[in-house]
Amino acid sequence: MRVIVKIGTSSLTSDSGEVNMSALSKLVSEVVAARTQEHEIVVVTSGAITAGVQKLGIPRPDEPEILQALSAVGQIDLMRAYGEEFGSHGVATGQVLLAPHDFRDRNQYLHAETTFKHLLRLDVVPI
């Protein structure tokens, strides 16, 4: 069975906006346990903007363009944290970034679907 796990910002970050490694470790352990029950797991995560805001030490802005830039900054640390936690269980991860056009355009959609299938066949957790 394929299972999609959505991990929200409040589940990943402390009140100060830092990635809460203890919480992340627990979530990853639960995902790893589900994988041992023959489930294919895909993780959908939030938290990149909050991680970017914390890293740069600035107040959270409202402008979409700046939020996107902060997401780019925070995404690196977030994926590093996921990679380290899953790696401690011997599980590889792969980053998949999707945009709205990946769902609207049939070719883009099929390309994304193929990528997910290959990652799962390689026993990689797509994030």
Residue ranges and their predicted role:
Residues 1-127:
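Nucleotide/pyrophosphate-binding catalytic subdomain
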